[in-house]
Amino acid sequence: GGESHQLAQVMAKEADRLNRVVSELLELVRPAHLNYQTVDINALIRHSLQLVSQDAQSRGIALQFTPRPELTTISADPDRLNQVLLNLYLNAMQAIGRDGVIRVTASEADRQRVKIVVTDSGKGMSDEELQAIFTPYFTTKAGGTGLGLAVVQNIIEQHGGTIRAESQPGAGAIFTLWLPVDAQRREDEQR
């Protein structure tokens, strides 16, 4: 009856979760080919924030972003960058728990690079945690696969960019991404 149906559901859900873990792992080892397009950073950030807005609202977390109309477009894979931002937001929401702020800013770092900064008012991290966060399987949260940030780093590096995390216990965290304006040309030159 009901109990075996519930069990079947739990098993299906678990199988689904494991499949996801495996596919994330495979992605980590061999990230898929990047599908380069002209990306409007403002639109990308707005879209990615929309995807988590309900979840954030239900936890009392404010999402702050002021678009910069003068920001240059970049050559990048929008789906992958979306994945990067979502991982960072979900990470931030987990660090905050309830009632806090996630702030996103975008600017031109220099002529060749744009900079996206995601700041949260969460619980922060120790030096040990900071050093380990981009390592696969490292997670400070129960029930997390701990692959999110390793995947994030992989995608950013694949774009020829860099990511840095800064944090102190009790003082939130700051994730800074630098992305080349024209990553595709660099990739072509490397072939």
What are these regions (language model features)?
Residues 37, 57, 62-72, 109:
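Conserved catalytic submotifs in the C-terminal HATPase_c
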Residues 10-17:
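Short alpha-helical segment of the dimerization/phosphotransfer core of two-component systems
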Residues 41, 124-132:
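Short helix N-cap motif at coil->helix boundaries in the Bergerat
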Residues 12, 35-49:
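A conserved beta-strand-to-alpha-helix junction within the catalytic ATP-binding
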Residues 99-112:
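Short beta-strand/loop element within the Bergerat-fold HATPase_c
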Residues 32-34, 73-76, 140:
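Conserved micro-motifs of the catalytic ATP-binding
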Residues 155-157:
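Detector for a conserved hydrophobic position within an alpha-helical segment of the HATPase_c
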